[in-house]
């Protein structure tokens, strides 16, 4: 890997770790420079601004999520329950890595980026979860007497809780735990008796 590409990847790795765990608003570019042992000009060679760096990280995060969901949903040897379990574990792990502070910073300090992130999350649910729920219906594990679009809309609204940091901070649960509880709550209303 060329040296400049390596530096770009290192910047993304260090910034990603800091931003996702601590949020990005209070993490200074100077602190990234110190940790990377490089200069501001080196960072700005790849990213025009801190917001550009955050946008690149969000794109990277969306790519990781989409690839993993695609891989799980496309796995021909897995049934609905196994796919659901893998998706729940993956999402729970992801929510453990992405702090409430990061999501709050996105919402407050970069509203356009937040809206873009939300649109991608909604598109992801419409795409991958639709396919998952369709499989569950075919396997007789999800009720077929409820409109699929309504199931997806309900799921989308319930999972919105995992990114609403104001409401989440009032609960004694991590984002990961909230997601697990939401999934359980949701499925007990959609699973068939047989």
Predicted segments, located by residue:
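Basic, helix-initiating cap at the start of DNA-binding domains
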Residues: 1-22, 26-38, 52
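Short amphipathic alpha-helical segment with a characteristic S/N-K-E followed by hydrophobic residues
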Residues: 11, 49-55, 64
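Short hydrophobic/aromatic patch on the recognition helix
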Residues: 37-47
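Hydrophobic alpha-helical connector segments
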Residues: 56, 60, 70-98, 152-155
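All-alpha amphipathic helical-bundle segments outside canonical DNA-binding/catalytic cores
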Residues: 81-82, 120, 138-154, 173-177, ...
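C-terminal peripheral helix-coil segments that are non-catalytic and often amphipathic
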Residues: 86, 93, 127, 131-139, ...
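Short secondary-structure transition hinges
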Residues: 92, 96-130
């Amino acid at each position: 890997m060329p040296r400049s590409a390596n530096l770009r990847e290192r910047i993304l790795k260090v910034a990603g770790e800091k931003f996702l765990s601590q949020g990005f608003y209070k993490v200074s570019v100077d602190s990234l420079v110190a940790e990377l042992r490089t200069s501001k000009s080196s960072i700005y060679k790849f990213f025009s601004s801190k917001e550009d760096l955050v946008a690149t990280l969000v794109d990277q995060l969306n790519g990781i999520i989409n690839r993993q969901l695609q891989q799980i949903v496309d796995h021909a040897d897995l049934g609905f329950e196994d796919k659901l379990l893998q998706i729940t574990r993956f999402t729970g792990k992801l929510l453990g890595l992405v702090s409430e502070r990061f999501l709050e910073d996105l919402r407050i300090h970069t509203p356009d980026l937040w809206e873009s992130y939300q649109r991608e999350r909604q598109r992801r649910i419409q795409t991958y979860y639709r396919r998952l729920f369709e499989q569950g219906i075919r396997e007789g594990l999800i009720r077929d007497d409820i409109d699929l679009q309504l199931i997806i809309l309900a799921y989308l609204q319930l999972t919105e809780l995992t990114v609403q940091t104001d409401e989440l901070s009032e609960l004694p649960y991590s984002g990961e735990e909230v997601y697990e509880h939401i999934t359980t709550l949701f499925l007990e209303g959609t699973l068939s008796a047989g």
